[in-house]
Amino acid sequence: MALQAEEEETIERLKAWWKENGQRLVTIVVVVVAGYSSWIFWQNSQTATVSAASDLYEQVLSLAVTDGQTEVGAEDRQTIIDLSEQLRSEFADTDYARFAAMYAAQQYVAMDELASAEASLRWILDNPRSGLFSQPDEALELTASLRLGRVLLAQGEAEAALQLVNSVDPQSFEASYAELRGDIYVAMDRVVDAREAYTAAQQAGSTSSWLQMKMNSLADES
């Protein structure tokens, strides 16, 4: 009898607790389940987005990456550009869109459409990787800045190119940036500065035969 009384007392306590806390507990459970369901939905959505963007980028790579001797045809160039624009339009927050924009810029340069190449490269720099746990892709941004500097120089905008180059910390790209700075100085008829920049490129580890030819050319002008 004592045990039964204890059980009945326990049941009464549970009833009283439920009456006081049950609704709040149900609310908490609903919120947790809804949050988990939303997270699962978001994860599935992200997976689908990445998969679709990846498929488009694979198409870009299949056309843009050659053996180094085969030139990309005119039709394939336009397809690369179209795919890049689709990635930027539909999947702008993905790295696939940023890398595809780099390939699009490459095609524009080959087509001598430098203004369009500039726009593609600026888009990369204006749309860095974002998100709470995301870190910028420094290698991609440094490459985009370097190529943008070259495009600006090719368009006759030496001052703008120099300003861009001087605003960047080149890190492991120091040799390439120093060489570009030398090219800019040559365009500005600043021979002494150009020689110093080319020397800095060599000291940073560049063994480019083309760089040596530039150095020799400056020596002939002295």
Q: What annotation goes with each model-predicted range?
A:
Residues M1-V31, F41:
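N-terminal positive-inside, membrane-proximal cytosolic segments immediately preceding the first
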Residues L87-A97, N127-E141, Q155, S167-S176, ...:
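Short solvent-exposed coil/turn linkers within tandem alpha-helical repeat scaffolds
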